[in-house]
Amino acid sequence: MKKTRISLLFFLLASVNTAFPQTEDITKQFNNAYRAFQSLNQEGKPEESLEFAKTALDLAQSLFDENSETMAALSYNYALNLMDAGQQRESAREFSKTVEIYTQVFGRDSDSLASVYFDEGRANAGLNARKSTRSFQRGINIIGDIYGTSSLNFADINLQAGIILSEEANLAIAERFFERALNIYENEFGRDNLYTALVNFHLGKYHFMNANVSISDTFLSEAIVGLESLESEDDVGQALLVAARGLFGRLNEVKAVRDEYLREIARNNEEVARINREMRQSSQPSRPSSIAQPSQSQQ
């Protein structure tokens, strides 16, 4: 799902009540803060725009209903801004508030709420794998209910979730999302498709990281064959093909390292067993020497 900032200026002035001077003053402050936020954000300055996003959100609380679309959009913008500024923990906290507002405004089965859950998952990805996975899964479930679990929308959001989780080293969790996406792409497009190749590459990379050489070989080979058959000249296809070939070329290296590691473990196990045997033998009590029998008493 492509993310776009939610613009508010087109309806702000029409929706704000300016009946009283105090409200007019707050409205002016709000619009100034939001314009500053939007301008700095468009210039790619999330850190500088952050204070204005927070000011706009705070001022809006006295101008709009707490469960209005405007408050939902402002909360979403602020949470995204925090994430862009590298403040993941604060972003995750704000997204939990955004989820509550979106649920009230749009309902529990809306595409909009799915987007919020997805970004909440992104914010938590490097902080808490369990919370991140839960948010992704909730968003994915909504998309599945709306478009169907065999739809390309469902495949796309699973692919995106898998990529984000794998980037944060949550590889085992990411594998499940990749496999869902792969099944749909293969059924829809076959092997010779960029999306199918992309998922095969990520699954090959996952098993490469876990030194599962034969499984990684299978997925990377599928990705390479699929990409070569496309004869794509675009940057994405070429970059993916180079990366897949690079990993594939290192599989023998990974196998050698893994085999040496396993041999070292075996040697260590043998040494530990030898030491344990020696310790058991040295701790056994020595046999008592023969004791002289007492002579019989004379009668």
Residue ranges and their predicted role:
Residues 1-299:
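Intrinsic-disorder-linked linear interaction elements in eukaryotic regulatory proteins
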